[in-house]
A protein has these predicted regions:
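Short beta-strand/loop element within the Bergerat-fold HATPase_c
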Residues: 61-74
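Short conserved segment of the HATPase_c
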Residues: 86-88, 100-111
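Conserved catalytic submotifs in the C-terminal HATPase_c
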Residues: 21-31, 71
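Conserved micro-motifs of the catalytic ATP-binding
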Residues: 32-35, 115
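A conserved beta-strand-to-alpha-helix junction within the catalytic ATP-binding
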Residues: 1-9, 67-69
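Detector for a conserved hydrophobic position within an alpha-helical segment of the HATPase_c
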Residues: 131-132
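Short alpha-helical Gxxx[C/S/T] motif in the catalytic ATP-binding
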Residues: 123, 127
Length: 157
């Protein structure tokens, strides 16, 4: 996943996020994620593009932090199963944009939810579906000082 993060960061730095500072906080000991590389690139590109747009609309000195970590105690119940699963691998994208509007925050992973004039509101919905198809979960935390999107995965067998 770190290779995918670096690939997407390079695309962003050479395109839509030229003026944004990227900070990396990777845990090199994490195991690989097994999945569709192209779909994971699509997810990360969408999240980083959203972060860069939030920063630009907030006119802050832009910074996006890409991080990975091992979370030893994350267990959740999925709606499709009664058993709890462990999702210890966490990959995050955090920005210092203006945060997500309260009016749409609860529904940001639903289709057609957007606060952008040019957007269709499908990016986070598609990202969420892709992560679910990889047996993971995507979470969001937001304040007026920025947003953090975290992707949680199980350890692959």
């Amino acid at each position: 996943m770190h290779t995918i993060f670096n690939h997407v960061k390079m695309i962003a730095e050479n395109g839509f996020a030229k003026d944004i500072n990227f900070v990396e906080k990777f845990d090199p000991s994490l195991p690989d994620i097994h999945g569709n590389k192209d779909l994971l690139i699509q997810v990360l590109l969408n999240l980083i593009k959203n972060s860069s747009e939030a920063i630009k609309s907030n006119s802050a000195r832009g910074e996006i932090t890409l991080s990975s970590s091992f979370l030893s105690s994350v267990r959740i119940s999925l709606p499709t199963s009664n058993k709890k699963i462990e999702l210890p691998l966490c990959f995050s994208i955090e920005d210092n944009g203006g945060g997500i509007d309260k009016e749409i925050y609860e529904n940001i992973f639903d289709p057609f939810i957007t606060n952008k004039k040019e957007g269709r509101g499908l990016g986070l919905s598609i990202a969420s579906k892709i992560i679910r198809d990889h047996d993971g979960v995507i979470e969001c935390g937001t304040t007026s000082r920025g947003t953090k999107m975290s992707i949680l995965f199980p350890i692959s067998d």
